[in-house]
From Swiss-Prot:
Residues 1-15 form the signal peptide. Its EC number is 1.8.3.2. It comes from the Eukaryota. Catalyzes the oxidation of sulfhydryl groups in peptide and protein thiols to disulfides with the reduction of oxygen to hydrogen peroxide. May contribute to disulfide bond formation in a variety of secreted proteins. The gene is QSOX2. The active site is at C66, C69. It comes from Arabidopsis thaliana. This is Sulfhydryl oxidase 2. It is an enzyme of class 1 (oxidoreductase).
Length: 495
């Protein structure tokens, strides 16, 4: 083939590629693999904005054929790098998103926001975008047009003015206000609701990855822990996911032999994401450390245990205690941590009769762990320099918790400690859910409020008897009804 023919052939290939919408889409997807801005469309627009933990959202309406949009994209991505994804510098504050109005499927969505030019940027609380719209003549709207964001610097300055921050494009990971924020900030705990979901999903994934349910003992331990989550997890989606695992457990793990691989059906544990398909997200917020290998998962697990402890009733206290002890002993993969925790469990000689006793035991155990790790990390230099282990709670958060203290010991007022823990890991922990629910529809507000609802009498039940815990958890009525229906429908298949 001559050089002329080769050039003609290459030209035809290029022409065909440029004229094919499918080819353009493929090329755009390849080039966007590392994009930080979240691509939204008419299908996922509401769900993504409704579920984001971020307090604010930026939505860019653009057209992929628009030269100005292509030139603006690097500027937008510089800002998105600060806020989006697992490597975000300031995660959980602003969600940066994009909608391609050149795609026919997005036409109605773009029309709802009266998009008059490209690119056009909007700002507001994420929930205000959900099933929302924008009209240029409307005087009062919580959705604002960003009128000064033509460069990355100007866009970030505009955002800084809105939220009273001083973020910079040169901010580096873990060298930021978010990581340096004082743990004594009472309002920080509201972000931990997402970290509890993250830690729950990560713990479940670790069990799947290690195929850790290997005996009747580990199977029983797993079931009891999932029962505890189904009744008392602070996240409704985690409670729902745990309930679905319970209902299907006999089929997923016949005789304790579980199938772990993820497939297209619902016949393996891997196909039941315990906190929903969007969790884990890949990053932590309240539990974010100043180094990649600090805090995170272990911090999230502690918040989970504290949040469970304040949600149980007196009759469940010892069941919750033995369930958590067995779970750590069977499924926590840090061997030294597991052994130390098990020793503290074995030191309890008398069964707990009051929920208060269990709340204080979790708190005391956490402080003992922190004391030990503080010494180890100081000698080895492995601690988090920005978040050193401390005795909890500090005086700044609960001065009444301290009767007296010196460098060697602290005399605690256990009644005030208990009241502090009940509030801090109870109503305070779900405050963000309550705040976000204000702007939602009635149905969504009810769902958000359910995150405050816990069981009042969840008891130990045999393996496979998910119905029993549903009946026992009287305050968890919706879940009980769901379980009863599922178990009733399953009976004919067991004949």
């Amino acid at each position: 083939m001559s050089l002329v023919h080769l050039l003609l052939f290459a030209g035809l290939v290029i022409a065909a590629s440029s004229s094919s919408p499918g080819s353009r889409l493929i090329l755009r997807e390849i080039s966007d693999q590392k994009d930080k801005a979240v691509e939204l469309n008419t299908t996922n627009f509401d769900s993504v904005l409704k579920d984001t933990p971020a307090k604010y959202a930026v939505v860019e309406f653009f057209a992929h054929w628009c030269p100005a949009c292509r030139n603006y994209k690097p500027h937008y991505e510089k800002v998105a790098r600060l806020f989006n994804g697992p490597d975000a510098i300031h995660p959980g504050i602003v969600l940066m998103t994009r909608v391609d109005c050149a795609m026919k499927t997005n036409t109605k969505l773009c029309d709802k926001f009266s998009v008059s030019h490209y690119p056009m940027l909007f700002w507001g609380p994420p929930t205000k975008f959900v099933s929302g719209s924008w009209e240029p003549k409307k005087d009062k709207s919580e959705i604002l047009v960003i009128d000064d964001g033509r460069t990355a610097e100007r866009l970030l300055n505009w955002i800084n003015k809105q939220i009273g921050s001083s973020y910079g494009l040169d901010d580096q990971k873990f060298k930021n206000e978010h990581a340096l924020s004082n743990l004594t900030d009472y309002n920080q705990i509201s972000q931990a609701v997402y970290d509890v979901e993250e830690a729950t999903a990560e713990a479940f994934d670790i069990i799947l990855a290690h195929k850790a349910i290997k005996s009747s003992e580990t199977s029983a331990s797993f079931i009891r822990f999932i029962q505890l989550l189904a009744a008392h997890h602070l996240s409704r989606r985690c409670r729902k996911g745990a309930a679905e695992i319970l209902v299907n457990y006999d089929d997923l793990c016949p005789s304790g032999n579980c199938s772990y691989e993820k497939s297209g059906g619902n016949d393996t544990l891997g196909n039941f994401p315990i906190c929903g398909k969007d969790v884990p997200r890949g990053y932590y917020m309240f539990c974010r450390g100043s180094k990649n290998d600090t805090r995170g998962f272990s911090c999230g697990l502690w918040v989970l245990m504290h949040s469970l402890s304040v949600r149980i009733e007196d009759g469940e206290s010892h069941f919750a205690f033995t369930t958590i002890c067995d779970f750590v002993n069977n499924f926590f993969m840090c061997d030294e941590c597991r052994l130390h925790f098990n020793d503290m469990c074995l030191s309890v000689k008398t069964p707990f009769k009051k929920a208060r006793d269990f709340v204080l035991w979790v708190w005391s155990t956490h402080n003992k762990v922190n004391e030990r790790l503080l010494k180890d990390e100081a000698s080895l230099g492995t601690g988090d320099p920005k978040f050193p282990k401390i005795i909890w709670p500090p005086k700044e958060l609960c001065p009444l918790c301290y009767l007296s203290s010196n460098q060697k010991s602290i005399e605690w007022d256990h009644e005030h400690v208990y009241k502090f823990l009940k509030n801090y890991y109870g109503p305070k922990l779900v405050s963000l859910y309550k705040e976000k629910s204000v702007s939602r529809s009635k149905e969504e507000t009810v769902s958000a409020t359910e995150d405050l609802t816990v069981a009042t009498n969840a008891l130990v039940v045999p393996i496979g008897a998910a119905l029993a815990i549903a009946i026992a958890s009287c305050a968890f009525g919706a879940l009980a009804c769901y379980w009863r229906t599922q178990q009733k429908n399953r009976k004919p298949r067991r004949r």
